[in-house]
Amino acid sequence: MRPSSAAWICLLLRIANYTCYSYHVGRSDLYVGRAPRRMTKLSYENGKPHIDAGVVNYFKQIREEFPFFKRENCPAYFDSAATTQKPACVIGVSCPIAQLHRFVSPLCLTASPHRFASPLRLTASPHRFASPQKLTQFYSSENANVHRGIYKMSLDATRSYEQVRKTIKNFINCEREDEIIFTSGTTHGLNLICSMLMERVIKRRQDEIHLTYLEHHSNIVPWQEQVKRKKKGKIKYIPLKSTGYIHIKRLRKRINRNTKVVSISHVSNVLGNIQKLTAIIKAVKEKNKNAIVIVDAAQSFAHIRYDLRRMEANNCCPDVLIASGHKFCAPLGCGFMYLKNTLTCSYKFKPLLYGSNMITTVGKYESEFESPPQLFESGTQNIAGVISMGVAINFLERIDQRLLCRYEMFLYDMLVYHLGQHLQRGLVQLPGGVSESGGSSGGSGGSRPTDPCRLYIHNSRRGGGKKVPILPLWSDQFSSFDLVTFLDFKNVCIRSGHHCASLLLKEFLRIPDCARVSLFFYNTPEEVQFLAEQIASIARMLSGMNRGGVK
């Protein structure tokens, strides 16, 4: 009987003493160590992705706001697409750094002081952030229910809770505060809007709901179940290009008078592609102005700023936009849904859940209800989570968006560059997974079937596509689970599996699973370089095991 993969792993660890090369984090410095005495500092060379050192320092200072990275032997965390780490101002853990001048970039002190705006829009406060440490503060001194009591503490809690609605409204620049509905996250929001539309909008069997293979299960399964149970509506899938972007011309041809809903992710949680949202919405609305466009912004909200009024002026505003707080530095269990007021007024939507906080009067046989948004927020909400979500948005708002995008994509380009340097012809960069005709496609980075090590990545940036710093990688020589297990031994966190996007893997990439690296602005170049080294080293080792007959 062949030994299991786990047995081989244990054996290799003992023989090779593999753990002698791991990621270390000290309190005052970040370094990559082959042993405590030897450190590999990041160095820039010709041909490498480059960014000004001052920009790197900006984000290293912002990283200081995150208590997670202050712990001893802190992991190198590359799973921010699953959930982000939380800053101290959100969760209520004190940080030792208190002076604002620590965030002033050296670039701001050069002869060209306006070359870069500071990523933090500094206030007159002597502290880095005017926002208190909300989660702890609320539960320790402000804990009261909202929309119920008339005593001061309850009124204060209600005021803080409703202020977040205004914060989100201003952040996405929508028309009205009552267009913002608090949810427990994107899954809740998608189930809520799915239920409402299936009740009021989808009336016939031929009514169409358009999705893509790129969607998270939360944007597929609710539609499938509602269509099956209510026996009305039908699901259609929007064609994709081989690069993973929506084929807008073919989408336009498919939109007709039966099209009722188009529900898409702005950013894929596996590929990281940023869809051309304005062009997609315009194409839909030009063919059917009554079609309802839903945008899953779970992966995009932390990286992209939305201006819904501007989009509305250009006839490319989504009717619904949904996001999860924990994906943009807020606590778990909170999120929001933007629901256009004209839509609510036209269809008189009914809520998914019934209970308290949503009624005006209750009779023996029927009740009268509040107006939106309270109509859709039944029961006791996650008050502390919502208030902390407002603090997280204020935190993000202080970071310069253009600088953030440049830095994150610099980290992404660095990762791809170093993978290429370490693996050479063994790195296969695919511009796509499935061709438009349905056959296999892909580009090759020059790898041959006889190469000792092959690692595939889907890199749409290679063809000029816009994306956020998410990189899927896999091999036909070893399992992504083995890769991630070995990385975990090295104190590195990335994810493996289908990433709640089974259709994308099966129908587009045509693989059973993959590993995923998702970067965020608190990651550092040193971490990324170490990650690339370890992925390459482990990939070569696992490929060698496979060639030796170990499976």
From Swiss-Prot:
Superkingdom of origin organism: Eukaryota
Keyword tags: Apicoplast, Plastid, Pyridoxal phosphate, Signal, Transferase
Record PTM N6-(pyridoxal phosphate)lysine, positions in chain: K327
One Gene Ontology term of the molecular function aspect: transferase activity
Enzyme Commission no: 2.8.1.7
Extent of the signal sequence: 1-22
Main location: plastid
Pathway it works in: Cofactor biosynthesis; iron-sulfur cluster biosynthesis
SUPFAM superfamilies: PLP-dependent transferases
Catalysis: reaction(s): (sulfur carrier)-H + L-cysteine = (sulfur carrier)-SH + L-alanine
InterPro entries documented for this protein: Aminotrans_V_dom, PyrdxlP-dep_Trfase, PyrdxlP-dep_Trfase_major, PyrdxlP-dep_Trfase_small
Cofactor: pyridoxal 5'-phosphate
This protein's GO CC annotations: apicoplast
Active-site residues, as the UniProt record annotates them: C500 (cysteine persulfide intermediate)
Pfam families reported in the protein's UniProt record: Aminotran_5
Keyword hit for Transferase: yes
Compartment annotation: Plastid, Apicoplast
Function: Catalyzes sulfur activation and mobilization in sulfur mobilization (SUF) pathway for iron-sulfur (Fe-S) cluster biogenesis. Active when in complex with a partner protein SufE. Required for apicoplast maintenance. Plays a role in the development of sporozoites in oocysts in mosquitoes.
UniProt record similarity statement: Belongs to the class-V pyridoxal-phosphate-dependent aminotransferase family. Csd subfamily.
Assembly: Monomer. Interacts with SufE; interaction enhances cysteine desulfurase activity of SufS.
Protein name: Cysteine desulfurase SufS
